């Protein structure tokens, strides 16, 4: 299991700052939102959405179930404001909160989250807490990312450390649980994994896209900032993982269903 400590204040700040650019760059996350919608088992009357972001999934939910009572939660106030703009005067309850700290009193037919649980400090405990808030026949449904996400970046970085003869526990980017580890977080969990690939003109463009969605380092740990290592990493990445002049970046998309 990947152990991590998320800097929640830093994460909140970065996602708020990127609320205006998120939708232009979150292509994979949008695909995942549509995939989640297809996995809803029963039409819900009460919905809790965790990590609503700019409201992309929120709008899909509201359009599909306009009579449902929908509560949307996000840790970043900037994201909440953007979501409110997207949904207009839709009767949605908005809550700016950290779901790991929030006390939940209501029961829900559907608890749903898109591309958020990878940022939880204690995902197993949070999943258990949320699963208890389901109504009878209720569903906890979420998408997240697995350990093979950005494997090209991690492979190239490991190569750069090796040729620089650096034997230190340095890393680049976040580390996520495996598909099996996500499934093991709840005894009723069922799941599916798939891979999505995006292409960029350069590694710098790839990094820029991550910055625009706020998905930069918010975890504690030792991150390498040596220019020589980054230069070697970028060279290896562009030599090894290029196709027709574009570098590729793989997303390991995981869908978990608890019913």
UniProtKB/Swiss-Prot annotation:
Function noted in UniProt: Converts the free carboxyl group of a malonyl-thioester to its methyl ester by transfer of a methyl group from S-adenosyl-L-methionine (SAM). It allows to synthesize pimeloyl-ACP via the fatty acid synthetic pathway.
PANTHER family for the chain: TRANS-ACONITATE 2-METHYLTRANSFERASE, TRANS-ACONITATE 2-METHYLTRANSFERASE-RELATED
Pathway where it operates: Cofactor biosynthesis; biotin biosynthesis
UniProt protein name: Malonyl-[acyl-carrier protein] O-methyltransferase
Keywords: Biotin biosynthesis, Methyltransferase, S-adenosyl-L-methionine, Transferase
EC numbers on record: 2.1.1.197
Lineage: Bacteria, Bacillati, Bacillota, Bacilli, Bacillales
The reaction(s) this protein catalyses: malonyl-[ACP] + S-adenosyl-L-methionine = malonyl-[ACP] methyl ester + S-adenosyl-L-homocysteine
Residues that span the membrane, as ranges: none
A Pfam family recorded for this sequence: Methyltransf_25
A GO BP annotation: biotin biosynthetic process
InterPro entries, sorted: BioC (IPR011814), Methyltransf_25 (IPR041698), SAM-dependent_MTases_sf (IPR029063)
Record GO terms (molecular function): carboxyl-O-methyltransferase activity; malonyl-CoA methyltransferase activity
Family to which the UniProt record says this protein belongs: Belongs to the methyltransferase superfamily.
Gene: bioC
């Amino acid at each position: 299991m990947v152990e991590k400590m998320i800097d929640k204040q830093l994460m909140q700040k970065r996602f708020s700052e990127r609320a205006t650019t998120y939708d232009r760059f979150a292509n994979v996350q949008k695909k995942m939102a549509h995939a989640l919608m297809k996995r809803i088992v029963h039409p819900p009357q009460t919905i809790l959405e965790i990590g609503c972001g700019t409201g992309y999934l929120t709008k899909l939910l509201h359009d599909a179930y306009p009579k449902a009572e929908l509560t949307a939660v996000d840790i970043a106030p900037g994201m909440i404001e953007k979501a409110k703009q997207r949904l207009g005067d839709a009767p949605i309850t908005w809550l700016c909160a950290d779901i790991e700290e929030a006390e939940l009193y209501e029961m829900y037919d559907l608890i749903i989250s898109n591309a958020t649980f990878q940022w939880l400090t204690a995902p197993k405990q949070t999943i258990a807490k949320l699963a208890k808030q389901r109504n009878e026949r209720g569903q906890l449904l979420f998408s997240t990312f697995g350990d093979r996400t950005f494997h090209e970046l991690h492979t190239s970085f490991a190569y750069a450390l090796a040729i620089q003869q650096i034997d230190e526990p340095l890393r680049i980017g976040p580390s996520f649980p495996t598909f099996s580890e996500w499934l093991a977080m709840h005894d009723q969990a069922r799941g599916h994994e798939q891979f999505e690939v995006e292409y960029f003109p350069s590694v710098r463009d790839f990094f820029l896209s991550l910055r625009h969605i706020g998905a930069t380092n918010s975890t504690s740990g030792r991150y390498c900032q040596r220019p020589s290592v980054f230069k070697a990493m970028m060279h290896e990445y562009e030599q090894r993982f290029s196709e027709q002049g574009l570098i590729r970046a793989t997303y390991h998309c995981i869908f978990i269903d608890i019913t």
